[in-house]
Regions:
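Non-catalytic accessory regions of SAM-dependent methyltransferases
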Residues: 1-70
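Non-catalytic substrate-recognition/targeting regions of SAM-dependent transferases
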Residues: 59-60, 65-67, 88-155, 163
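Conserved class I S-adenosyl-L-methionine
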Residues: 171-178
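Conserved SAM-binding loop of SAM-dependent methyltransferases across substrates and taxa
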Residues: 181-192
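Conserved SAM-binding motif I beta-strand of class I
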Residues: 195-200
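S-adenosyl-L-methionine
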Residues: 204-241, 245
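A short glycine-rich, Lys/Arg-flanked "PGG" loop and its adjoining helix->strand segment in the class I
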Residues: 264-277
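C-terminal catalytic and target-recognition region of SAM-dependent MTase-like enzymes
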Residues: 280-335
Length: 335
């Protein structure tokens, strides 16, 4: 077993993968630079991941991601590199920031986040530091925290999941467990949900969720925010049910509150008493060691009235040489 982290940066222990990260060589940096030049030449109108090295498709760049935040380029490095490699990466990024492709894209700020260090410090290589930044995805607006926290506030790999929820939500009561900053809730309200109940222990994250709803001019009387430990709050959750759609998107590991392999079955076990007669569940996992079969088998054991329907695709900007190690977003239907 080795210490690593899931595709969003949460610490987990997994079996050693066969293709170990390679040194970040000059050739690897040239590959990254060329990729970013091409991406900036056709910069998207909305927030997107521009480079997903963590999918292990580019040797030497396995621990690096680059996100386009509509004028802000956020580069995240998840594992230590040598001082020489870090300096070379910084210089390459500075060169990129003074290129014609950079100017033509409308970019103005460039951040390098060192996710492997305590508190994930961020270096502002270009542009004036800003604490909050508003972005757009699929026509919806979200507020991000830049340079202050490990995660900025929206997991871009779940883009298709949010779109799916928006398409499914009309007229439904929705339960959003492990809600974080309520991205699913925003999508559900935009899709015409009757009510959304968000639960997360992190009240600061839920507060940002309120901000996200306000950015989209949503009626907050349709949204409930529960800042509680789920395993001590089943009664509060049930009070607002039954639910037509339940979303479960937990961290792989949260010290003192959630261990996916141990606690996920406890959540699944409660679904039959929370779900409406023909309700739907979107069950998600980012832990590399746990493939989709784990969730399918766990659901069959803990909530046999729910049947696997489909696995949502991951966005194409998140290629992965081992798809079962990437994000799993599985749909289950009650019959």
């Amino acid at each position: 077993m080795i210490d690593t982290d899931d595709s969003r940066g949460a610490p987990v222990k997994i079996a050693a993968l066969p293709n170990r990260p390679q040194p970040m060589t000059p050739d690897a940096l040239i590959t990254l630079q060329q990729h970013l030049f091409y991406a900036l030449n056709s910069a998207p109108n909305e927030t997107r991941r521009l480079f997903h090295g963590r999918g292990r498709c580019w040797p030497g760049l396995e621990q690096l991601t680059v996100d386009w935040l509509q004028g802000v380029l956020l580069v995240a490095l998840f594992k230590p590199v040598s001082d020489t490699e870090l300096a070379a990466l910084q210089q390459m990024l500075l060169d990129l920031g003074h290129s014609a492709a950079w100017q033509d894209s409308g970019a103005h700020s460039l951040l390098l986040q060192l996710r492997y260090l305590p508190e994930s410090p961020t270096q502002w290589l270009l542009g004036e530091p800003v604490e909050h930044w508003d972005i757009c995805e699929h026509g919806l607006h979200y507020r991000l925290d830049l340079g202050k926290k490990q995660n900025s506030g929206l997991f871009l790999d779940m883009r298709y999941g949010r779109q799916w929820v928006q398409a499914q939500a009309a007229g439904k009561r929705v339960l959003n467990l492990f809600a974080y900053t309520c991205g699913f809730s925003v999508a559900a309200l935009a899709g015409g949900a009757h009510q959304v109940v968000n639960l997360d222990m992190a009240r600061a994250a839920l507060s940002r969720g309120r901000d996200n709803h306000r950015l989209n001019q949503h009626d907050l009387s349709q949204v409930v925010f529960l800042g509680h430990d789920l395993f001590k709050s089943w009664g509060k959750v049930a009070k607002y049910g039954p639910y037509d759609l339940i979303i479960i998107d937990p961290p792989s590991f949260q010290r003192g509150s959630f261990v996916l392999s141990k606690d996920y079955p406890k959540v699944l076990r409660r679904l039959p008493e929370l779900l409406s007669e023909n309700g739907t569940v979107l069950a998600c996992s980012n832990e590399p060691e746990i493939g989709p079969d784990y969730l399918i088998q766990a659901m069959a054991a803990e909530a046999p009235s729910l049947h696997f329907s489909e696995r949502l695709d991951n966005p194409p900007e998140f290629p992965d040489s081992q798809p079962d190690s990437a994000l799993k977003a599985l749909v289950f239907q009650r019959h």
